[in-house]
Structure formats: C-alpha cells, structure tokens
C-alpha cells in the first residue's frame, strides 16, 4: 500500500480519495516535521512575553478581549473543543470522515498552525489504525471554517466524543465506540491540548473540502459516463453523429465542448446502426436538442466541474486556521483564511454543472420511451398495455431532476450572522458541500436509468449492432441485468446498474 508523505503543499485530490477509501496510508514528511517544530517553538516563546495573543491566552470570538490566566490555558483549549462540538444530524460516511482527518493533518503539516508534533502524530495514528471520528454532518456555517465538525474530530483526540473503529482491511461493520475507548482499543492514548492546539484543530475549511472533494471526483467520472449513456441512447434512437464533428466544436472553442464531442466520436466509431440510416433515404434533418447538443451541455458541465477542481486542489493544501504562526518572521497574525467562500462558491458551481448531466439525460429517456419520438414500442414494453415497461423509470428520473433543481439553489448567496455579530458574514460552505453530494448522487441514479432504458432500445434494434465501445458497455450491463421481457420490479435493475456505475465497470 502506498504511503503518502504529508507536507501541506503537494497533496492531490486523487490522493485524498485513496486515503479516504483505505487504498493508501499517510505519514508526516520530515521537512514538514521540522516546520511543525519551529511553529510550535514560536507559540511557546510568545507564551513568555506577557502579551495577549488571540486563541493562545485569550478567549475566542467576541470573548477575545478576555485574558486567560496561565494556569487555565490547558483548560481553555479543552473547553474550546467541548463547547464547539455542537453538530447534529447523521455522521459523515467513513470515507468523508477519513478525508476530513487527512486534510486537517495535511494543513497542520504546513507548519503555520502552532500544533505540537505529538498531537499531529496522534491524528495520523488514528488514521493509520482506523479510529475514525463520528462527525455529525450539520452545524457548520462555513466561517470560522467548519467549527463544529472539526470540534467533533478533536473530541476523539482528547478521549471524548465517539469514533468508529474501522481498521483498514478489516471485515465486518465498523464498531461505534466512545472516543477514549476507540483510542484504547487501537493502542493509543488521548492528548492533553496545550495552548493554541484546540484552535489549530477546530478552525478551518476541511469538512466542506472533504465532502466536496469526494463529490467532485465522483462527478468527474459521471461526466464521462454521461457521454456513454448519451451515445447508447443516440444509437437506440438512430440519431446522427454529424453534430459531433470537430469543426463544429472548434468554431465555438469551448474546451469542455471540444472534449465531450471528441469522446462521443470515439464512443460511436464504427456503428452499424449509424450506417443503416445515412444517405439520401434518411428522413431526419435534425435530432432533438437532448441528442444534438450533448457536446454543448456535457461540455459546459465539464467546464464547471473543472473550475471546482481547481479551487479544491488549492484548498486541500491551504492553511485555513486563525491565527497563523510564521516562524520565519516571528509573527503570529490574525486573518480570515477560515472563510469558506471560495469553496462554497465552487461547490455551488459543481452542483449546478452536474445537475445538467441528469437534466439532459432524463430528456433522452423521454425520447426513448415515447413511441412517437422513438419509433419503438411504448415505454419499450413487451406487449405494451399488459406491461408498462420503463414508464415509471422515466418518472423516477424526472423526480430526481426536479429535486436537483431545488438543491441547486446556491448556498453561497446566503449568510447569517453569529457569535454576537462578530462573525457577521459566513459562507455556508458545508451546506454547499452536502447539497453537491446529493446532486451528484441523483445524477448517478439518473444516468443508471438512462443506461438501463437505452440498453433495452439497443436490444430492440437488433440484429444491427451499435458502435463497438457502446456494444461492450451494453454487454457488461447485460451480465447483471437481463432484457426486460415482462414487467418486474425495476428498482432492483436500477440498483444493479447503479452499482456498475459505482464500480466503474461501465466507464468508457
């Protein structure tokens, strides 16, 4: 198993996924360890200068003017973690919680947070030994960062809260335990937080970045899969390949459109079905937009997803706590890097971009099941009337598309003041992340439905064969889901194709 060396500078989104899914380990890079030592030394030095330093020997937020006696500084950090662990709702799924731990460790590895080596080592040991904090999804407004989610992470470090014990490679369901018990079972001991450490752990954008990163990576795969689903539908509807010609795309110059059209051309190369309806005998002049404009719509989605990738690629290596500790200049400086606006905006774009993959997919399903549009039996049903075929599969897709329209209302346009007016503009970044995650999940199901329905259409076009790559995907789908010869409970078929999507088994 690959071991990633965290340095706060070079972590990639794909590496985040690898650690989140248990496919890679993480350790602290030697150079990062030295930076951590130096930043901690500066914090310790400032403790001796008699001055007020925010979050080190003062209260927090609107209580920043309150000086805390030296004897109470450890208690101050513990109280910060306890008081901020006010999250509610379902716990983050294990991959997202692991990504959260990884991202917080990577940020601390930059050496500008003032954390001790010992505390950072415990965080990485938890990741290594499968101690995964129970982190409620809700309760963050995205500034000062994701306070509540990160506080729930920090609870486990101090032997409080709850954790799943899920050692990498272990079989069975993870065990949910009190945090201290989970540490003990993993052979670890809780830490007593020193001045600045509680603040270094709870202040940052890592929850929204963790959820958003995994949603983004899934959306990227779905953008490619949308081309396959669209190509399969196009073949089933005897659609034209001509709108995907490179000169059309070059005349507009949008990079996502150019990439999507190239992918569609590759998927559709060598199609017998296409050859069967070319030439002067073809009665079609133009296909519906949901077929003809796939490069433009899928391409715009790709461009939006790419924008989100750029933001998150920077954010996973960003120092987003406050104050920041700069040992090279000897300064500890308060700022606003905890504000999640860049991530919130990017995740709203991700949701809107991905939603269009489902919206146009559902319209293609309508083309397939509507006999006046497809020339195929109504709802692709055998003995239609007695059988309803894929009638309600299209309705399910429509329901998810409409749900996405609600979810795509941007979270980042909202703000609500908190902390007695001190935190008077917030990002709602975690809300954007959770919404984007659900939108992407809905897109996956809509594409699974389209693939299922398009496969039936291809069956009905036999003996003519589709393009080779479309035929290969059709064959893989048919290994799991048989042709619909009479009505059956379609939810099982939708679930089976959705699993194929998750496994990457249909990826072109």
Curated annotation (Swiss-Prot):
Subcellular location: Cytoplasm
Numbered residues of crosslink 5-imidazolinone (Ala-Gly): 143-145
Matches recorded under PROSITE patterns: PAL_HISTIDASE
Domain of life assignment: Bacteria
Keyword rRNA-binding: no
Classification via InterPro entries: Aromatic_Lyase, Fumarase/histidase_N, HutH, L-Aspartase-like, Phe/His_NH3-lyase_AS
Modified residues (2,3-didehydroalanine (Ser)): 144
Disulfide bonds: none
Keyword annotations: Cytoplasm, Histidine metabolism, Lyase
Record PTM: Contains an active site 4-methylidene-imidazol-5-one (MIO), which is formed autocatalytically by cyclization and dehydration of residues Ala-Ser-Gly.
Main subcellular location of this protein, as a coarse class: cytoplasm
E.C. number: 4.3.1.3
Pathway it works in: Amino-acid degradation; L-histidine degradation into L-glutamate; N-formimidoyl-L-glutamate from L-histidine: step 1/3
Family named by the database record: Belongs to the PAL/histidase family.
HAMAP family referenced in this protein's UniProt entry, alphabetically: His_ammonia_lyase (MF_00229)
Protein name stated in the entry: Histidine ammonia-lyase
Organism: Anaeromyxobacter dehalogenans (strain 2CP-1 / ATCC BAA-258)
Name of the gene: hutH
